Amino acid sequence: MVTSLFKSLGPVRGVNFHQTQPMFVSGGDDHLIKVWNYKAKKCMFTLQGHLDYVRTVEFHWELPWIVSCSDDQTVRIWNW
């Protein structure tokens, strides 16, 4: 293991690494989406809005968007 980062209030269900930045996004059972800087080893910001488990998170390959899918039956596009 290289490092470990903890801030989730439940299991993490989805993780996606940014293609060019030292970042990844995570989503899970706490209904939150967190954007992490893995070089700084800290959570940069948290996105709130889903009403149930976040199952999938992904950075858009070109635009400053994060797409998330939740058990609340919504797909959300976040402008970060």
Please report, for each region that a protein language model flagged, where it lies by residue.
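Structural WD40 beta-propeller signal
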Residues: 18-20, 60-62
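Short coil/turn segments within WD40 beta-propeller repeats
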Residues: 10-13, 22, 30-34, 42, ...
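Short hydrophobic/aromatic-rich motifs at helix boundaries and adjacent loops
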Residues: 4-5, 16, 36, 78
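Short C-terminal beta-strands that terminate individual repeats in beta-propeller domains
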Residues: 2-7, 14, 27, 43-49, ...
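Short loop/turn segments that connect beta-strands within beta-propeller blades
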Residues: 38-41, 80
